[in-house]
Structures are given as structure tokens and as C-alpha cells.
Amino acid sequence: MLSNPSQVVLRNIELFESKNVLLINHECDLLATALLEDAAKVTTLALDFNHFQRIKSHENARLQCHFGHQLPSTQTFDAVVLFYPKSKSLAPYLLNLAGRHLIPGGELVIVGEKKGGIRSITKQLPDYFDGGIKLDNARHCMLYSSSLLSEAPEIKLSDWVKDYVLSTPQGELTICNLVGVFSEKRLDEGTELLLEHLPTLKGRVLDFGCGAGVITAALLKANPDLELECVDINAMALASCELTLAANGMQAKVYASDGLTQTQGMFDAIISNPPFHDGLDSTTEIATRFVQESEAQLKSGGIFQIVANRHLPYSDTIAKFFKTVNVAAENNKYKIYANRKA
């Protein structure tokens, strides 16, 4: 099943006849394989690891799939399809990236949901693209086209990052935020409560859903000898976490993982401010899987400590897999769940 934006792209498949096409920030579907009916070759760059996993197994001589914030080569394409990001601040970066990978005069096709920022895309196009035209309007989405007029500037991550000093219970930290990565530029209430009640940790520790690396850096500030691993599904978050580590002179293993699937071995502790906040059934299912996988990959006596919104049903899930529920701290918004594996 194709997402609405992907369906609109497929409605206009004639744009890609016999062309070498790049998809940037694509959806969690198989649009790339469908485009091969007309396109000569398709390359995909997913910024979401789950979206990459969805298409990766379909790779062949005409389909190349990548995950990350940039392609591993300077290859150029006849056409680039850019899926407008949910975070509007990420759009200028992706437009720059698209420009770097287009041949002179190459076509940029931009698709997005109307409720996003796609309506004003012609005002957002940098001057190395022409003004852009609307090609389609369907499935609650809009599709625009623009041509590359001149060479797009080289991408340097340092141009797309904002750093700031954050005061935490463990001390001051420098946090690096790339565009598109959530930041309040202060310690959010949930993370603050978690850091205020961190246990003494040692050994191999996992920071699940690391984001820009706030918890990561705080853990290493408290104990630089931790064997710390940091996972997320967002390419910009992972790159931000690496920049945060470098800015604080710290080291950890940072990589993409769907839940805990890509992690290996057992951990002495799993610490997290899990990115599941809306309480929807689908989100609750993911959260349940996270608790189950965490219990399975903790050593005996290992620590599982997370912060969560009070209204989320973590208690029953934790009781199911850890046999007991321990709330180490709470306020009117959040709870700290702290359990040890039997």
C-alpha cells in the first residue's frame, strides 16, 4: 500500500521515463519498485531507518537503497523526488541536498501533504532552482516541479547545526542540534526528572531513542567509563548525537536500530526517554515491544529506567515483563519507572 504522497508521485510516473531517479526522505512503502516500470534506475535515501528497512530487501541492479543524512557518493541524477519533511526546518537542507545530486537542468519533483508546508514551496526554493510550478493536486497532497539553474552549494553539516550549553544535574553540556531534530534549547521536564534520579551505572549501557544526545552526554558526564551505545531511527538525530559527543570530548557507539533489533548482546542498563507520546494503539504496541525487548536484553540484575507521560499505560506492560513495577519518582506530568531484571 502506497502512502498518499507516493500515490501522487506514481500518478505522474511519465515524468521519470528512462531517467535515473533519486528519492529523498521517502515514505515507508515500495514506491521505488513501482517507479522502475518507467525509470531506468532508482536510488533511495531514507532519513528514517524504518523506511529504509521497508525497501532495502528489494534492492537489485536497478534499485540502490541508502539510509543517512547524505548519500555515500557525489552521484548525480536526471530527476530527484523530494518528500517534503514533517519538520519544516529540515526543508532547506533537503533542497540543498537535492540540488547537489541533480545534473545541470535536472528536474526536482517535490511532493507533500497539504497540511504540511508544501503550499509555500515556491517561496522556499533557493535561487539555484527556478520558480517552480504545480503539477498535481490529489489525495490531500500537492506535487511541484522545478529545474536546477546553477550549481547548489556544497553541504557542510556545520552550516546546519545549532549548539547550545545545557545545564543538567550532571553538569553543563554542549548539545548540537541539526535541523529537523527536536529541541527546546533547555532541559525538558521529562528528561530533567530522569536525570535527577539516575542510578549509579556501570558496564554496557544503552540509550534508546538518543535524539541529539542529551541523555547520552549526561550519562558519560556522570561516568566517562561507561560502554555506551546510542540508538535512534532518525538519521539527523544520530548525526546530532555524534556531534554532541564530539563537542563534549566523549565517545560512544551511535547507530540506527528498529527498536532493539540491531543491538547485539546483553546490557547492564537501558535508559530512555522513549519517543512514544501520543497513546495511540499503534504507539502503545511499539512501546510494549520496547519493554519486552529491553527485558530480554538485560543481564540479570540489569537496570531498566525510563521516563514517560503519566497517562501512558506503561505500568501494565512493565508488570507483564518485569513481574513488578517500581516508580522511582513522579510529578503531575511524568513518572520514572525503574526496574531491575530478576
Curated annotation (Swiss-Prot):
GO cellular component: cytoplasm
HAMAP family hit by this protein: 16SrRNA_methyltr_C (MF_01862)
UniProt catalytic activity: guanosine(1207) in 16S rRNA + S-adenosyl-L-methionine = N(2)-methylguanosine(1207) in 16S rRNA + S-adenosyl-L-homocysteine + H(+)
Signal peptide: none
PANTHER family the record matches: RIBOSOMAL RNA SMALL SUBUNIT METHYLTRANSFERASE C (PTHR47816:SF4)
Chief location: cytoplasm
Keywords for this protein: Cytoplasm, Methyltransferase, rRNA processing, S-adenosyl-L-methionine, Transferase
Family (UniProt): Belongs to the methyltransferase superfamily. RsmC family.
SUPFAM superfamilies linked to this entry: S-adenosyl-L-methionine-dependent methyltransferases (SSF53335)
EC number(s) from the headed UniProt entry: 2.1.1.172
Keyword rRNA processing recorded: yes
Record text on subunit structure and interactions: Monomer.
Record-level Gene Ontology MF annotations: 16S rRNA (guanine(1207)-N(2))-methyltransferase activity; nucleic acid binding
Name of the top EC class for this enzyme: transferase
Name the record gives this protein: Ribosomal RNA small subunit methyltransferase C
Main function: Specifically methylates the guanine in position 1207 of 16S rRNA in the 30S particle.
Location in or out of the cell: Cytoplasm
Species annotation: Shewanella loihica (strain ATCC BAA-1088 / PV-4)
